Amino acid sequence: MQIIRDIAMLHRAVTALKQGGKSIALVPTMGALHAGHLSLVRMAKRVADHVVVSIFVNPTQFGPNEDFAAYPRDEARDAALLVEEGTSLLWAPDVGTMYPGGHSTHVEVAELGADYCGAARPGHFDGVATVVAKLFNQVRPDIAIFGEKDWQQLAIIRRMARDLDFGIDILGAPIAREADGLALSSRNAYLSAEQRTAAAAFPGALKTAAKAIADGADVAETLARAEAAIVGGGFDSVDYVALADADSLERLAVFRAPARLLAAARIGRTRLIDNLPVG
């Protein structure tokens, strides 16, 4: 596996990988790789000839009071895992490479980024869309793979890729979960043992709510019960629990397919997100 940090070297390496009509799948990450990330890499291997993984902890998607400095980083461990998975290339730029002096352009997907995590984390999705657009231009993949755990992010990237004519197939990978249902996340490492036990209440409440809504229960009442169950299970607060159109992300007061149950909640200093299909 090549580890590259320079854009000119990246372009040469990508050109070599594409010789003979070979295809490339990109898996963008912020590192601190876990089994969920590795499931994306394996999916990429199934759909393309070569897999490029990027590791970049993107400062522009963190708010001023968020965990950029504390976000876990262990490139040597991550690289070893990617070698085991047969990754062709690791793109690991630094902040100066991604955002050189004078950088002043950003991408905004206004409609899809305004609600849910966008409301709780102003500017977050502008940072995500901008860095992903740059990664697309740098790597020039045929396919890009993102986890479905951040459903809003996936919807935003799909819209951006369509609106800006990137010509890249955007694939979503199913959420990888622990045995008790908690979605795998690098931020799970922040949880104490007690918090980790309590965190199972989050996916449990969403699973119950998704089934109830699909079975015809009142949406508003079901969402309120889910919020109460999450807080009752040990969470400090709930940012949102919402039923949304799976494509447009429009909030739904009455169930119609395709729909997704979206949620974010806080336990201690950790903010967790999750979602489930409904129906």
UniProtKB/Swiss-Prot annotation:
Pathway(s) this gene product operates in, as recorded in its UniProt entry: Cofactor biosynthesis; (R)-pantothenate biosynthesis; (R)-pantothenate from (R)-pantoate and beta-alanine: step 1/1
Residues engaged in binding (R)-pantoate: Q61, Q153
E.C. designation(s): 6.3.2.1
GO cellular component: cytosol
Domain of life of the source: Bacteria
Binding site for beta-alanine: Q61
UniProt xrefs under Pfam families: Pantoate_ligase (PF02569)
Compartments reported by the entry: Cytoplasm
Record keywords, A-Z: ATP-binding, Cytoplasm, Ligase, Nucleotide-binding, Pantothenate biosynthesis
Coiled-coil ranges per UniProt: none
GO biological process: pantothenate biosynthetic process
Binding locations of ATP: 30-37, 147-150, 176, 184-187
UniProt catalytic activity: (R)-pantoate + beta-alanine + ATP = (R)-pantothenate + AMP + diphosphate + H(+)
Chief site of localization: cytoplasm
Gene Ontology MF terms in the entry: ATP binding; pantoate-beta-alanine ligase activity
Catalytic center residues: H37 (proton donor)
Catalytic class of the enzyme: ligase
Family stated for the protein in its record: Belongs to the pantothenate synthetase family.
Miscellaneous field: The reaction proceeds by a bi uni uni bi ping pong mechanism.
Function: Catalyzes the condensation of pantoate with beta-alanine in an ATP-dependent reaction via a pantoyl-adenylate intermediate.
Subunit record text: Homodimer.
Protein name, entry field: Pantothenate synthetase
Organism: Sphingopyxis alaskensis (strain DSM 13593 / LMG 18877 / RB2256)
